[in-house]
Each structure stands twice: as C-alpha cells, then as structure tokens.
Amino acid sequence: MPLLSNLSCMAKNHSIYLVANIIDRKPCNESDHSCPRDKVKFFNTDVAFSRNGTLISRYHKNHLFIEPFMNPADPYEFAVFDTDFGARVGLFICFDVLFAESSLLVEKHNVTLGVMSSWWFDELPGWYSVGVQQAWSIHNGIPLLAAGIQRLEMGSLGSGIYAGLRGPLNYTYSPDGKSKLLLADLSNTSSVDPRYHGDVLNPKQRFLKHADVSDHAAQELEESSGDSRVCHGDFCCSLSYEAEELHDKFVLLAKHGLTNVASYMELGIEKCILAVCESVNGTLCKNFSTKSTTKFTKLQLTAEFTTNAVFPVLASNELALTPKDKWQFETTSANVSTLTLKENGNDEGILQAVLYARKYESDRFIH
C-alpha cells in the first residue's frame, strides 16, 4: 500500500516514531454478525511506525462519533507499544477520550504516554478540544500528544503536548486554518509560555456549539465575592470566590444524569460549572461567551462526585488555557474534587471553571 509505504519511509528517513490517522479497509464474511452487505468494513485507524520504519501498532477506533461509513472495533481494542526512550505509548482517537478505555490504557496496560489523533467539534462549556485534552492528561497523570485537524467551518481545531499535572508544554488553539508543528521537551520543568507563538489570540469569529443547560440547576452570581451552592437532586456544586468586580455575568451550574450527544447517544455525567453566560429571551444561560475581563483573587469550585473519573478545565479569556501553575486540582479518596485558583493567580479574565465526571456505566444509545 503506497500510503503505508510512504509513512514507513518517512519514519525511517527521519529516525522518528510516527503515528498517523488513516482509514483501514478490511474484508469480512457472514460469520461476522456485523459484516455489511458488501462484505467490507472500514475503520477509523491510527498506525504507528518505529524509527526503522516498522509498523509496530495499529488501532481501530472504539467509539465512533457520527461516522456512518465506519465500523467500531469489536471487541474494543487497546493498542500499546514500547519505545527506545522508555515510554510505553497508548493510542486512541478523538471521541475515545470521553470513554473508560482511554484511561484503562494507563490503569491496566501501564501506558506512560498517550497519543491522540482528533477531529473534534467544540462545545461550551468545557468540552472544547484543548480543554478536554489537558483534562485527560491531568486526570490520568501522564503526558499526552494530541493532534487535531483544522476545519474552521465545523469548529474543529486545537492540538497540544501536555505533561500531566504540569499542564501544557505547547499547544495551539487558533482558528486560522494553518498547519503547525508543535515541539516540547517533556523533561523540561522550567516555566514557559505554553501557547504557540503564532496563534491568533483574538479571532474575529469562532464556530462553537453551545450546550443546552436548561435542565441544569443554575444560580447567577450577584455579588463580587461570597459563597454559592447549587444542587441538581442530591448532586451539589459549591463555589467560594472573590473578585474586585464582576464585569461579566457568571452562572453556577450543576447537573447529574445524562447528556445528549448529537442525538444518537447519551453519556452519564456529573457536572459542576462556573461560566460566563449570555441570556437570550429571558433564558438565564442560553449561550456561553468566549470573553471575560473579570479577574478573581479567589476561586474554589468543589463537588462530591459518585465516581473518580473527574476531569478539570479552567479557561481564561478567549478560551486560553489558564496557566497550570496558577491553579490546582485535587480529588480525595471520597471523590470530593476541588479546582482552586492559587493566591495571586491569573492575570487574565477567568471565563469558565469546570469539573466534569463521567459515569461510564450509565451511557446508552438513543437509536
């Protein structure tokens, strides 16, 4: 196959490990209960090559996201390979990041470096590409290399190199349609600006999906400092905060249950969110802003979850990832999770603080 040969030569000629996303075509027969009528299956696939050009790993995507011409891996796959620099690499693709198998790579297969290819569709609050990428790396405590496609008209962008609890080492989130090469030294612990220096920081337009939060418990912040608590059933979200002045409309949101994904499946979730909201026709939180000028001197978001699969996101003005040395995330053995802005923290306006948990066992398909 010319494509695989070209990728193999690229890895060998440059003496690098190479992971690429391709479509894999496989014949099947009647003994396979999921075999299509044309006896051919197509898989969203990542392939990995060693420095000498050898194909060392192949992964078929487990969890499809509106990919009608693709087949999911059956049974679920775990693609892992070892490197000559001491890392054990685990592969997953895009939507997989929201499911248990991507974390089981770490828990059950001892992966020390995640590699993710992606065609992501941004959704606010919280579920936008680089926010999700960083959250996975923090939750699992290992580095992640994430490469995302640029399709501006679909709200698809965002790539990064993340170092677990240390946060991003280099990331890009710029709707400019340009390909970029991100480089980082995972062993470097010095504090550097992780944003790709060619990014457009204040774009004229973004394409974002705004989540319907009409079924969330919600409470607007009225004062510039104080404590707030909102509950959705037995699940409660607490906030303690101080700001010189609230220049933006912030709403505290809580949700326990299911969230609809593209009208074809529902994911089990628990969400605790502080976000800048826009009211439309009397609806408290219809749209989510990408701009904030409110600077908090204190911010602590806390919730007691029923699972330990909790993922944190803290975003500043224009959805920039708030520098990780400005905030911390902690989870106790009782699944009480806290996101805290450190003293003398961020100089930028805080846009969203999100703690979202996944209840994998509650997931279900609608059709």
Kindly give the residue locations of the regions a language model identified.
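Cys-nucleophile CN-hydrolase/nitrilase-fold catalytic domain and related Cys-dependent amidase chemistry
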Residues: 1-52, 120-143, 149-153, 265-272, ...
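Active-site catalytic loop in hydrolytic enzyme cores
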Residues: 2-16, 24-112, 118-135, 155-156, ...
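C-terminal beta-strand edge segments of enzyme domains
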Residues: 149-367
